[in-house]
Curated annotation (Swiss-Prot):
GO biological process, one term: protein modification process
Top-level taxon in the UniProt lineage: Archaea
NCBIfam families linked: frhD (TIGR00130), hydrog_prot (TIGR00072)
Keywords noted in UniProt: Aspartyl protease, Hydrolase, Protease
GO function terms (MF aspect): aspartic-type endopeptidase activity; endopeptidase activity; enzyme activator activity
Protein name per UniProt: Coenzyme F420 hydrogenase subunit delta
Family: Belongs to the peptidase A31 family.
Length: 183
């Protein structure tokens, strides 16, 4: 067996045993954090579903749309390492900043809140420190598209968005599309 054949076989073996999630093999990740079972907490799921319908197949080759649910954003972010292709992460979530329900707030990496004073999401999980760490450690651009929730039913199940948050879905999609397409 010549060297060229050996190299080709080794390359195929590397691909067979590559356990890197597909979303870490793309340049841009849109990370939805939320749960449709808890009213406005489902905001990000509606946004990601609309983006999935609007983005072209060509765009999806470099953009990963990740519905991480309410509990998995931390797990997704902890899988990022120096081998990840990710250069930009856009997090979509409801926020609790005491602004008008349905209002969209764009949060840049440097504006990520100190969880002692503001919660990035409406849960008690401090996502902001992990986002900041990933951004700085791996030189990844991070933005959060947050929507002020009106009502989160957790722990009770309520499927559906409040009128204010439902109206904000299209606005968030427009903002994200401009960010993705450079418009």
């Amino acid at each position: 067996m010549n060297e060229t054949m050996k190299a080709e076989i080794e390359s195929q073996d590397d691909e067979l045993f590559d356990l890197t999630p597909s979303y870490l093999k793309k340049e841009i990740m849109v990370l939805a954090c939320g749960n449709i079972l808890f009213a406005d907490d489902g905001f990000s799921v509606h946004v990601i579903e609309k983006l999935n319908k609007i983005l072209t197949d060509k765009e999806k080759q470099k953009i990963a749309l990740v519905d991480a649910g309410a509990g998995a954003p931390q797990q997704v972010l902890t899988l990022i390492d120096e081998n990840s292709k990710t250069k930009k992460i856009i997090v979509v979530d409801v926020i609790d900043w005491g602004i008008k329900p349905g209002e969209i707030k764009i949060i840049e990496k440097d504006e990520l809140p100190n969880p002692k004073y503001h919660r990035l999401d409406s849960h008690d999980w401090p996502l902001a420190p992990l986002l900041r760490e990933v951004a700085e450690k791996y030189n990844i651009e991070v933005k959060v598209v947050g929507c002020q929730a009106k009502y989160i039913s957790e722990p009770d199940v309520y499927i559906g968005l409040s009128e204010e948050v439902e109206k904000a879905v299209d606005k968030a999609v427009e903002i994200i599309l401009r960010e993705l397409r450079g418009d």
